[in-house]
């Protein structure tokens, strides 16, 4: 407790110092930074193209990238955004995802038991999670479209309309992408509890509805709540559940709306997935794959988001994948790896080949084990909390730092150092804590 108070006081004093004294330092370093050669040549490698220049949304005309230098990458078979595709990417079953492997007992009895407790043991997070069941049934996420198609505008205008619908429903970010085939699971887990005792093939159903477009809805988990959280306390799970539920509600409404217009549309959210969300995020121009290996970072929100998606055959004009320098940044930062409570995140310098593409090879078993058995709270979001790409404050100096961090490896080292100096991500700020903790409920039963 004493250490937390010291960190809090230190963090606040550093913020005050930064607000009055960091301008000259930051501007001086910005002027001195030069991107490495491989970054300078990236445009030729990735085939950068400018944005369309057309209005993307009447309610939100431009993305809020918090000052990051964002480049747009064309869609092709060799790259998904900045993720290099080496060979044909193999499609995977949802039954092989980390949490499902825990349910199957592949990580031992404690994570298997913990999966059914780790959210519910926090009364608030468990209540939000319960509400997700209301939008989980197949007849809620999917259904037959109207027999007659309603005349619709051209794909560009329809895409603008779809984004506006999502923003009206209180999405924080929205993206539209071309859906790669490997973005779908081969099989969807239809009987999670059954995985404990039954053969996998009796618990899954094949994914057969492969649509060409994906709409991704992103919800902010809450910056002030994150400031007050340790990253693995009681509110950690509830932050995720709130964003899962909210994005899921928007997705099922949007899918129903599209079906009413006469087009196929299926919602995908945390209680009923047939699609892989990191792939959807990258395809829809909302993030890049990070050092964690299975999570995508948004230029403004960092990890501080959850998403749902709608796959559809509605004619749409896709957004372009992003490059805001994350690969070079993650290569040198390693702050998530330094702070991971179960040492699950890789310290490797470079991504390695996995399943036909390049990613950092983190230990997903260790990650799942800690999240399902954590007795100090509910789940874990430490990597989210400490990541410098979370815009910790809506201020010029943090936006300047984000801009610097998107300029290459040398600049990335600077942003990470500034993040550390001013205590971002490692302090807990008590004045923003609004929830109750229930430590007696966090112990595994």
From Swiss-Prot:
Binding-site residues for [4Fe-4S] cluster, renumbered to this chain: 330, 333, 336, 340
Signal sequence region: 1-42
Entry keywords, A to Z: 4Fe-4S, Cell membrane, Hydrolase, Iron, Iron-sulfur, Membrane, Metal-binding, Repeat, Signal
Assigned EC number: 3.8.1.-
Cellular localisation: Cell membrane
Cofactor note: Binds 1 [4Fe-4S] cluster.
InterPro entries given in the database record: 4Fe4S_Fe-S-bd, 4Fe4S_Fe_S_CS, RDH, TAT_signal, TAT_signal_bac_arc
Source organism phylogeny: Bacteria, Bacillati, Bacillota, Clostridia, Eubacteriales
A Pfam family per the record: Fer4_7
Protein name per the record: 3-chloro-4-hydroxyphenylacetate reductive dehalogenase
Any one Gene Ontology molecular-function term assigned to this protein's record: metal ion binding
Keyword field contains Signal: yes
Main localisation: membrane
Topology of this chain in the membrane: Peripheral membrane protein
Cofactor(s) required, per the database record: [4Fe-4S] cluster; corrinoid
Entry comment on modification after translation: Predicted to be exported by the Tat system. The position of the signal peptide cleavage has been experimentally proven.
The protein's assembly and partners: Monomer.
Enzyme class, spelled out: hydrolase
A GO term from the CC aspect: plasma membrane
4Fe-4S ferredoxin-type domain: residues covered: 320-350, 368-397
Main function: Catalyzes the reductive dechlorination of C1-OHPA to 4-hydroxyphenylacetate with reduced methyl viologen as the electron donor.
């Amino acid at each position: 407790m004493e250490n937390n108070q010291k960190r809090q006081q230190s963090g606040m004093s550093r913020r005050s110092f930064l607000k009055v004294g960091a301008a000259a330092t930051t501007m001086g370093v910005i002027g001195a930074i030069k991107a490495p050669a491989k970054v300078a040549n990236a445009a030729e490698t990735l085939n950068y193209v400018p944005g369309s220049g057309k209005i993307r949304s009447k309610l939100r005309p431009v993305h809020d990238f918090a000052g990051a230098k964002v480049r747009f990458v064309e869609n092709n078979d060799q790259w998904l955004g900045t993720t290099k595709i080496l060979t044909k990417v193999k499609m995977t079953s949802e039954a092989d995802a980390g949490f499902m492997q825990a349910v199957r007992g592949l990580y031992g009895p404690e994570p298997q038991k913990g999966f059914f407790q780790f959210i519910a043991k926090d009364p608030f997070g468990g209540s939000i999670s319960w509400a997700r069941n209301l939008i989980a049934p197949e007849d809620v996420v999917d259904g037959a479209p109207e027999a007659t198609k309603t005349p619709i505008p051209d794909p560009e205008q329809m895409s603008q309309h779809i984004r506006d619908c999502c923003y009206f429903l209180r999405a924080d970010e929205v993206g539209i992408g071309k859906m790669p085939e490997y973005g779908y699971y081969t099989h969807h887990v239809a009987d999670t509890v059954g995985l404990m005792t039954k053969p996998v093939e009796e618990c899954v159903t094949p994914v057969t509805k492969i649509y060409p477009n994906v709409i991704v809805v992103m919800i902010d988990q809450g910056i002030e709540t994150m400031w007050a959280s340790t990253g693995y306390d009681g509110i950690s799970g509830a932050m995720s559940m709130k964003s899962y539920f909210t994005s899921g509600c928007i997705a099922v409404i949007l899918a129903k709306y599209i079906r009413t217009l006469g087009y196929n549309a299926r919602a995908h959210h945390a209680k009923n997935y047939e699609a892989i969300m990191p792939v959807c995020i990258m395809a829809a121009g909302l993030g890049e794959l990070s050092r964690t290996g299975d999570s995508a970072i948004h230029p403004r929100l960092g990890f501080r988001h959850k998403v749902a998606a709608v796959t559809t055959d509605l004619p749409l004009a896709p957004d372009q994948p992003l490059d805001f320098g994350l690969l070079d940044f993650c290569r040198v930062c390693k702050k998530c790896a330094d702070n991971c409570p179960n040492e699950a995140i890789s310290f490797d310098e470079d991504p390695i080949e996995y399943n036909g593409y390049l990613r950092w090879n983190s230990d997903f078993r260790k990650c799942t084990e800690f999240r399902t058995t954590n007795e100090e709270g509910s789940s874990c979001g430490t990597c989210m909390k400490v990541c410098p790409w979370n815009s910790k404050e809506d201020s010029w100096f943090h936006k300047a730092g984000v801009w610097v961090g998107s300029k290459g490896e040398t600049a990335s080292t600077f942003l990470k150092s500034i993040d550390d100096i001013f205590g971002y991500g490692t302090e807990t700020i008590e004045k923003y804590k609004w929830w109750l903790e229930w430590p007696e409920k966090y112990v595994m039963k």
